[in-house]
Design a protein with these regions (language model features):
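N-terminal Rossmann-like NAD(P)+-binding subdomain of aldehyde/semialdehyde dehydrogenases
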Residues: 1-31
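Residue-level signal for inorganic ion chemistry
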Residues: 3, 64, 95, 116, ...
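ALDH superfamily catalytic-core signature
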Residues: 90, 123-277, 300-301, 340
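Conserved C-terminal structural/oligomerization subdomain of aldehyde/semialdehyde dehydrogenase
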Residues: 150, 256-360
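Short glycine-enriched loop/turn motifs at secondary-structure junctions
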Residues: 109-110, 143-145, 175-177, 210, ...
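A generic structural signal for well-ordered alpha-helical segments
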Residues: 60, 132, 196, 232, ...
């Protein structure tokens, strides 16, 4: 765990480090000593409310800082429990939890912290950065974006479909590095659709009432996803829903959710969205749900153009065996962490740095 790793290595990390001194400065010596920044503010999101609150807090406190945490108001029970447990072990001037709505978060981001950590959407991250800049507070922003998933013509479709489904449907797609859209070679649409349906059925034999299949966080976000689908359909997209309880069968558009019982439980079935284009909101906004738009391509240059036309993503996924093609794509695109023939690894590998570029 992060806590165990930090405790094991903290003494070495904090140890003063001697550096070489130029001859003309002898007999002087020089060393680097690390010291705490002071008070670190943390604004954590709702999608992983423990990990993304306590992870930054562990790092900040290990470095000797005090922490003020503003957890998300969309997970009030988790936030209340965090405040209760933290209050049992820390004094308020060591580790404080501030609860409240978006207005409280806005005021929180304008406090004169020595450092401010924010995890959330790009739109809110911009507002946080502007507020922090008024105090000249340095920030660490972990945002998101539309992480592309590229399937090459030589990829193992069944393996790719299973790993893409896992990455897409973990927490019902409410993960900052979930595959946001798929780039698929023309001619492989039916084969991938069948493989994806089979993979989803293997992971989730049913959706409604299945405690292993996550719900969308609230009705507002559920309604937003519904609007994305309806707008895409109105603009010519074709939505294929994976029918609940039908195993590997790929449902037709006629079996779309009723938006009744599903909406009440907020368990939106997975769907592949075909025939999408860049003018659709579903291709402009980070989806944060179990919807996977698919773009068919003929040449890798089309893939490069599609990725570079948008904000730089937090993650990029490549499925294929041709190393030259893979390296060509990676040289010509800019993103955060890259995973080859799998998904979600940028956050799963504890010894790799995690972060994005630009808007991510």
């Amino acid at each position: 765990t992060m806590l165990t790793h930090t405790l094991r290595h903290l003494a070495r990390w904090m140890k003063p480090r001697r550096v070489w001194t130029p001859l003309h400065l002898l007999p002087a010596s020089a060393r680097i000593e690390r010291q705490p920044l002071g008070v670190v503010g943390i604004i954590s999101p709702w999608n992983y409310p423990l990990q993304l609150a306590l992870g930054p807090a562990i790092a900040a406190m290990a470095a000797g800082n005090r922490v003020m945490l503003k957890p998300s108001e969309l997970t009030p029970h988790t936030s209340a429990q965090l405040a209760h447990v933290i209050g049992q072990f820390f004094a308020p001037d060591e580790f404080a939890v501030v609860q409240g709505d978006a207005q409280v978060a806005s005021q929180f981001s304008g406090l004169p912290f020595d450092h401010l950590v924010f995890t959330g959407s790009t739109a809110v991250g911009r507002k946080v950065a502007i507020a922090a800049a008024q105090q000249l507070t340095p920030t660490t922003l972990e945002l998101g974006g539309k992480s592309p998933c590229i399937v090459a013509s030589d990829a193992d479709l069944e393996q790719a479909a299973l790993r893409i489904a896992h990455g897409k449907l973990l927490n019902a797609g409410q993960t900052c590095i979930a595959p946001d859209y798929l780039l698929l070679p023309k001619g492989q649409e039916q084969a991938f659709g069948d493989a994806y349906a089979k993979a989803v059925a293997q992971l989730f034999p049913s959706f409604m009432g299945n405690p292993d299949y996550a719900a969308i966080i609230n009705h507002k976000h559920y309604a937003r996803l519904r609007v994305l689908v309806q707008q895409a359909e109105a603009q010519g997209a074709y939505v294929q829903w994976l029918d609940d309880g039908q195993g590997a069968q790929l449902a037709s558009a006629a079996t779309a959710p009723s938006w009744g019982k599903e909406a009440a439980q907020r368990q939106m079935p997975p769907a592949l969205v075909w025939n999408v284009h860049s003018g659709m909101d579903i291709m402009r906004e980070e989806i944060f749900g179990p919807l996977l738009p698919v773009i068919s391509y003929e040449h890798l240059d089309d893939v490069i153009h599609a990725i570079n036309a948008g904000e730089r993503p937090l993650a990029l996924y490549w499925f294929g065996n041709d190393e030259k093609l893979r390296d060509s794509v990676l040289r010509r695109t800019v993103s955060g962490g890259v995973t080859v023939n799998d998904t979600l690894m940028p956050v799963a590998h504890a010894f790799l740095p995690f972060g994005g570029v630009g808007g991510s």
